[in-house]
Design a protein with these regions (language model features):
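Flavin (FAD/FMN) cofactor-binding and adjacent substrate-gating region
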Residues: 77-78, 82, 93-162, 166-169, ...
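Flavin-dependent oxidoreductases
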Residues: 20, 56, 70, 176-294, ...
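C-terminal catalytic lobe of FAD-dependent flavoproteins
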Residues: 148, 251, 286, 290-425
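Glycine/proline-enriched, intrinsically flexible loops and inter-domain linkers
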Residues: 389-836
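Beta1/beta-strand and adjacent pyrophosphate-binding region of the FAD-binding site
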Residues: 3-17, 34
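Dinucleotide-binding Rossmann-like beta1-alpha1 core, especially the glycine-rich loop
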Residues: 51-125, 251-256, 260-266, 274, ...
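Glycine-rich FAD pyrophosphate-binding loop
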Residues: 26-47
Length: 836
């Protein structure tokens, strides 16, 4: 086959994702797109070819739900979707509670046709189920099955019909050339193609292909067992592939679905079986296909018993035999999310990997938008390939987390649940001190961060009834009342915080100012010694990130951002840098300690002869001071809304700084405080927004209540959109709500955790003019104000202080009141403490 000598884009991989990316690129106006695969068409041998092809709509992740819903829309438009309905059944009370959570998520994301069923109702829809084995089910009418191979063919044909797509099956990639850190050429068995961009959509082979370019895609091939049994007498004469709802037996990590005259049974309950991409055979050597391995019967024995329990009529029928059984290979990542976006290793090299059939077309569309327009309609920050830190890309980490996550595919995962594998990778220099204080560690970007300290138990007695106690087992998981006690200790005296997980990078050189001006919404041409908190916008004026920037010199800026977003922010700034600017990652060479509270100044003053008075050290400024024997960069800024500083030192001096502050703080009642205070209680009392919660690309600065009086003259990414937003009436307004009554029908008090739908008093969903529904973006205690605080975007007519609404939580509706519309804090609304 003759290949073009040049392509604007080469898409490698003809599964559902590759076909979708290629089609949507041509739909958005790109020509000279080449789509190739080493396998034959229509089934080149990847995971698409053996996928079960059913799609459930509801996920607790807003991002994944949006990609799935868009995929279903596209499958329907292509005529390859059969709506069958689906039921997730529960064998336990805990699972029934989880199904009520899924009902709430459906409400938050606008999925209709959902209901909770009792066993009899499940039996009416799935007559071959043994209803005595279950307590109930969660029905989603919009569930269905697709013909993903046919969908891929139709997409290819659309691109070819437009004259913009060249398709090359049976063409293997042998190399990807990179020059000056940018992709230049794709080498194949049929010749070379000069390429401006390359998209790797190779599924389980993606890491191997990425390595050809010196890049990394962190995923591992893993086994998912499936069998087909039949012929099933009940399905004899079936007029379509599926006529009964698909069943997910959630407590056993299994599913059962009609497949014509057969029953397909799949499992995520067996032991994790992982492979390396190099272990996958070539197409010509595979017995069935490169991603269909021999079935290991021993791994399925227990699962077959579970299927027999649930569907004895079919599975127990001796006339129904096994017709097909495989260890199907699919992609797993260390955090369970796809790997999308431009590689941080090589410019022009894009990834669309670890994407399953259910979100394939939606992902292809979103990635194409990102490539063409610089962003997608759906916020993809949780799937961004740039999110991974270096240790998270290692083979050992990928395999450890993938193995742990595999059996949680249908698991009940708490919003705060922590990973157990591959911990203690990044430790603060004062980690031993924290352990001595009984720190309970949560992980952030590999860093072990104290969430609370068990040594603060005496504070529970000190603050007594001011501390909320949770009695519900669910809300008590991964939580302690000590968080609220530490919060009050900080508010009344002072708190010491481990902020080691910050990502810190310097931008220096003659082009430094122009680089940060381009990326930041706020004015960065400020005097040296100033600290600027700034949103970072996407081209359409949504939130790419939010962070602080210190100007340390005429040509020296220090960017400080969160650990989770750190690597993506680093790539974003690096991509915007102009000539004469350089970026240096300081994260592993510095450590940060936070000191806040009304006595923070007294504590710091006891360690230094420098002037730290309000007149001598204004809020929003930074400078180097001497703390004991150390030179410390002190930044007077606060994310908890109290007087204090972030203190930066070289990492080898961090222990000494901790000890110095701890000793100085003892007479002042200094308490070690965890991230439960920093990231939740302190933040929410001040109505501070958080990236990934309140701040997403789907919302703008005006809606978030973060507009400044003026817009700087200098250009920056998203400026045109931002100016337009300032002239328009916002479609939604960020509000702070408080819960009026926590009592459930049982009398137990319940506390929302986030992502619950907000409803009107007559129980109607609130949707703005752009189609975005209202849901709780953040939730947590406000110990100083004595309220449980929720944040949510509301339409202008509902964003009225005093307006009463409802929040749906665990199958019940609780009254809430709009306490703030906009940015005014609940606690210290005049900001007198932070500026004291």
């Amino acid at each position: 086959m003759t290949l073009p000598a040049h392509a604007r884009c080469v898409v490698i991989g003809c599964g559902i994702v590759g076909n979708s990316v290629a089609y949507h690129l041509t739909r958005l106006g790109w020509g000279d797109v080449v789509l190739l695969d080493k396998g034959p068409l229509p089934n080149p041998g990847g995971s698409t070819g053996h996928a079960s092809n059913f799609i459930y709509l509801v996920d607790h992740s807003k991002e994944m739900t949006a990609l799935t819903m868009d995929s279903v829309r596209q499958y329907q438009e292509l005529g390859v979707f059969i709506q069958s309905g689906g039921i997730e059944v529960a064998r336990t009370k805990e699972r029934m509670q989880e199904l009520t959570r899924r009902m709430a998520s459906a409400g938050s994301w606008g999925i209709e046709g959902v209901s909770l069923l009792n066993p009899t109702q499940v039996k009416e829809l799935v007559p071959y189920i043994d209803e005595s084995m279950i307590l109930g089910g969660f029905s989603t009418a919009g569930v269905g099955v697709v013909d993903s191979l046919r969908a891929g063919t139709l997409m290819r044909e659309k691109g070819q019909a437009a004259g913009a797509l060249h398709v090359a099956p049976k063409t293997e990639v042998t190399g990807i050339d990179v020059e000056h850190e940018r992709v230049r050429r794709v080498r194949t068995t049929d010749g070379d193609i000069e390429a401006e961009t390359v998209v790797i959509t190779c599924g389980v082979w993606s890491p191997r292909v990425a390595r050809m370019a010196g890049a990394r895609i962190p995923l591992t091939p893993a086994v998912h067992q499936m069998i087909d049994i039949g012929p099933v007498p009940r399905f004899r004469g079936a007029k379509s592939d599926i006529e009964h709802p698909i069943v997910r037996d959630m407590d056993t990590n299994m599913y059962e679905r009609q497949a014509g005259g057969d029953l397909e049974i799949g499992s995520y309950a067996h032991r994790p079986i992982l492979y390396d991409p190099e272990d996958l055979p070539p197409v010509e050597q595979a017995a069935l296909s490169p991603t269909e391995f021999p079935f290991t019967q021993a791994d399925f024995e227990e699962q077959m018993q579970h299927a027999l329990e649930l569907m004895p009529e079919i599975v127990g029928d001796e006339s129904v035999g096994v017709k097909y059984a495989i260890n199907g290979i699919l992609s797993l990542t260390p955090d369970g999310m796809p790997v999308l976006g431009e590689s941080p290793d090589v410019k022009g090299l894009w990834s669309a990997a670890a994407v399953w059939v259910k979100e394939g077309p939606g992902t292809g569309k979103a990635l194409a938008e990102w490539m063409v327009h610089g962003e997608s309609e759906i916020d993809l920050h949780s799937s961004d390939i740039a999110r991974f830190h270096e240790h998270q890309k290692t083979r050992a980490h990928v395999r450890a987390r993938a193995a742990e996550g595999f059996n949680k595919t249908y698991g009940i995962v708490h919003p705060s649940e922590q990973w157990a594998s591959n911990r203690n990778i990044r430790l603060a220099p004062f980690h031993a001190r924290e352990r001595e204080l009984g720190a309970v560690f949560f992980e952030a970007a590999g860093w072990e961060r104290p969430q609370w300290y068990e040594s603060n138990a005496p504070l529970l007695e000190e603050f007594g009834d001011r501390i909320t106690r949770r009695t519900s087992e669910w809300e008590s998981r991964w939580w302690s009342p000590l968080i609220n006690a530490e919060h009050l200790a900080m508010r009344e005296r002072a708190g010491l915080f481990d902020l080691s997980a910050f990502t810190v990078f310097d931008i220096v050189g003659p082009g430094a100012l122009a680089s940060v001006q381009c990326a930041a919404l706020r004015q960065m041409d400020v005097p040296a010694g100033r600290v600027v908190y700034t949103p970072v916008l996407s081209p359409n004026g949504g939130f790419k990130s939010d962070l602080t920037i210190m100007r340390l010199g005429d040509e020296h800026f220090r960017v400080v951002t969160g650990g989770a977003a750190g690597m993506a922010d680093k790539k974003w700034f690096r991509d915007q840098m102009v000539g004469g600017a350089e970026l240096a990652d300081m994260t592993s060479s510095m450590t940060t300690i936070g000191l806040w509270g009304p006595r923070a100044r007294d504590i710091l003053a006891d360690t230094t002869s420098d002037d730290v008075s309000n007149e001598g050290f204004k809020f929003g400024s930074c400078r180097t001071i001497e703390v004991g024997t150390q030179r410390v960069l002190a930044s007077r800024i606060s994310y908890v809304g109290d007087l204090g500083w972030e203190l930066y030192v070289p990492i080898e001096q961090g222990l000494k700084l901790w000890d110095t502050l701890w000793e100085a703080g003892r007479p002042h009642g200094l308490a070690a405080c965890g991230i439960g205070v920093y990231g939740t209680t302190g933040r929410l009392e001040k109505c501070y927004r958080a990236h990934g919660n309140e701040l997403e690309t789907e919302y703008n600065v005006v809606e978030a209540g973060m507009t400044a009086p003026r817009v700087k003259e200098e250009d920056f990414i998203g400026k045109a959109a931002h100016l337009r937003h300032r002239e328009e009436e916002p479609a939604a307004i960020m509000c702070t709500l408080t819960v009026d009554d926590h009592r459930s029908k049982s009398g137990e008090k319940r506390y929302m955790l986030g992502r619950e739908p907000i409803l009107t008093r007559d129980r109607k969903r609130i949707v703005d003019r752009l189609g975005r529904g209202s849901y709780v973006t953040s939730a947590g205690a406000g110990p100083s104000v004595g309220k449980h605080i929720l944040m949510a975007y509301l339409t202008p007519e509902h964003a009225v202080v005093g307006n009463r609404l409802l929040v749906e939580y665990m199958g019940e509706r609780y009254p809430v009141t709009v306490a703030v519309a906009g940015a005014t804090p609940l606690f210290d609304p005049e900001n007198t403490r932070i500026r004291a």
